[in-house]
Every structure is written in C-alpha cells, then in structure tokens.
From Swiss-Prot:
InterPro entries reported in the protein's UniProt record: SCRL
GO CC annotations, alphabetized: extracellular region
Compartments, record wording: Secreted
Pfam families documented for this protein: SCRL (PF06876)
Signal peptide range: 1-27
Name of the protein in its database record: Putative defensin-like protein 168
Domain of life: Eukaryota
Keywords (A to Z) from UniProt: Antimicrobial, Disulfide bond, Fungicide, Plant defense, Secreted, Signal
Any one biological process term the GO annotation gives: killing of cells of another organism
Family: Belongs to the DEFL family.
UniProt source species: Arabidopsis thaliana
Disulfide topology: C32-C90, C43-C66, C51-C84, C64-C86
Length: 90
C-alpha cells in the first residue's frame, strides 16, 4: 500500500508537469496579427519566449513590418509616425 500511494503521488505530479508544459508550448505557438499605430522603437524588437513585456505588459512582437506615414496635421517636417503591422505571440 505504501508503494502504491507513493506511485500515485508521483504519477499526479508528473502528469501536472507534462500537461502544463504542453499547454505552455501550445500557447507560445499560437500567433495573432494586429494592425495598430506602433512606433518603430517598439516594433523593431524581436519577441522572445516571454509573451508579455515586463515593462509594458503588452505582447512582445515576433515580426513587424513598418511603413512611414505623414501625419494629417503636420506641425513640423519631422512630424510622422510608423504604421506597423505586427505579428504577436499570444
């Protein structure tokens, strides 16, 4: 009985570890696409295994394509933004 109890406890812990690891890998492999107005400093960084940035608490971009667009209300010659389409881990 003692060995059976030890076996069951070990089996439960191993099952929880394997299930959580598989779920984590599946979550990382899911990719969502969003199109928003991001600045090149944000879009230029490649994502890593962490889903959320520790500083911004936003998803880290995996791949981004940015285009320079002039603002409608140009106040200076440098008044423009980068319109980026970013693919995120989510």
């Amino acid at each position: 009985m003692k060995y059976f109890t030890l076996f069951m406890i070990s089996y439960i812990f191993i099952s929880i570890f394997v299930f959580s690891h598989i779920h984590d890998v599946e979550a990382r492999n899911r990719i969502c696409r969003t199109s928003e107005k991001y600045y090149r400093e944000f879009c230029g960084h490649a994502g890593n295994d962490d889903c959320l940035s520790k500083s911004t608490k936003k998803p880290k971009p995996f791949k981004c394509v940015c285009h320079d667009n002039r603002s409608q209300n140009i106040t200076s010659i440098n008044d423009r933004y980068n319109n980026c389409i970013c693919t995120f881990y989510c």
